[in-house]
Design a protein with these regions (language model features):
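Alpha-helical segment proximal to the catalytic Tyr-Lys
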Residues: 127, 171-175
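Conserved glycine-rich cofactor-binding loop
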Residues: 13-15
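Active-site helix of classical SDR
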Residues: 122, 158, 166
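Substrate-binding pocket helix/loop in short-chain dehydrogenase/reductase
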Residues: 98-99, 103-111, 201
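Residue(s) in the substrate-gating loop at a strand-loop-helix junction
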Residues: 142
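C-terminal substrate-recognition "lid" of short-chain dehydrogenase/reductases
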Residues: 134, 212-236, 241
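Conserved glycine-rich Rossmann-like NAD(P)H-binding loop of the short-chain dehydrogenase/reductase
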Residues: 27-44
Length: 242
């Protein structure tokens, strides 16, 4: 159902985003890979998509927290691909710290990238979706946004905000045939999470192990193609938030 469509993936040069790009490309979607700073990594991802999946793939450097930069990037994607039908908002950062010692700039940076960046991309992509008469948006939130997490008040707040944004966008855009859902990963083994083998929270995961980036990518693929699902938050967490 994604063959020949164009998917835009933010934070697509590594980790969960990279896995999502490969999954969508394997389904036949052309991919626009948005990255923050590592051009070589983004181009490596695109080259693999072209070589192994035979799809069009281009990379775009963009600070999604910048409203104007996001607008310019979407305009360039439109010029390159003509349209787009899929948006996966995966770009995210952490600036962990105890609340009493957290710097204002660390709180703002996380909210700006994780929450405002997602708003910026949805805001500028909506026009493409309306003209295409279809659209599937998937926002990558976190179980931290559902449960909270000590030392991550900024990150948890940003991810909780994504859940509210997802449901509001779903209600607003449903009459136009545009769906919006979210995936809430738990402990996923990536370069962003680092080595968590000694984290006591792992003992609370009913399945007894960390997830993999491909587990999240599979959930995204489902939501992209599930034409009668909108406004939902799909947990991929091994049962930790039950």
């Amino acid at each position: 159902m994604s063959k020949g469509k164009t998917a835009v993936v933010t934070g697509g040069s590594r980790g969960i985003g990279e896995a999502i790009v490969y999954k969508l490309a394997s389904m036949g979607a052309n991919v626009a890979v948005i990255y923050a700073g590592n051009a070589a990594a983004a181009e490596r991802v695109c080259e693999k998509c072209r070589r192994e999946y035979g799809v069009e793939a281009k990379s775009y450097q963009c600070n999604v927290a910048d409203f104007s930069a996001a607008k310019e990037t979407v305009a360039q994607i439109k010029a390159d691909f003509g349209t787009a039908q899929i948006l996966v908002n995966n770009a995210g950062i952490t600036r962990d710290g105890l609340l009493a010692m957290m710097k204002e700039e660390d709180f703002d940076a996380v909210l700006n990238t994780n929450l405002k960046g997602t708003f910026n991309m949805i805001r500028h992509m909506t026009g493409l979706f309306i003209r295409a008469r279809e659209g599937a948006i998937v926002n990558i939130t976190s179980v931290a946004g559902m449960m909270g997490n000590a030392g991550q008040s900024n990150y948890s707040a940003s991810k909780a905000g994504l859940i509210g944004l997802t449901k509001s966008v779903a209600k607003e855009l449903a009459p136009k045939g545009i769906r919006c859902n979210a995936v809430a990963p738990g402990f996923i083994a990536t370069d962003m999470t680092g080595n968590q083998t000694d984290n006591p929270l792992l003992n609370r995961i009913p399945l007894g192990k960390m997830g993999e980036a491909d587990d999240v990518a599979d959930a995204v693929a489902y939501l992209v193609t599930a034409k009668y699902v909108t406004g939902e938050v799909l947990r991929v967490d091994g049962g930790i938030a039950m």
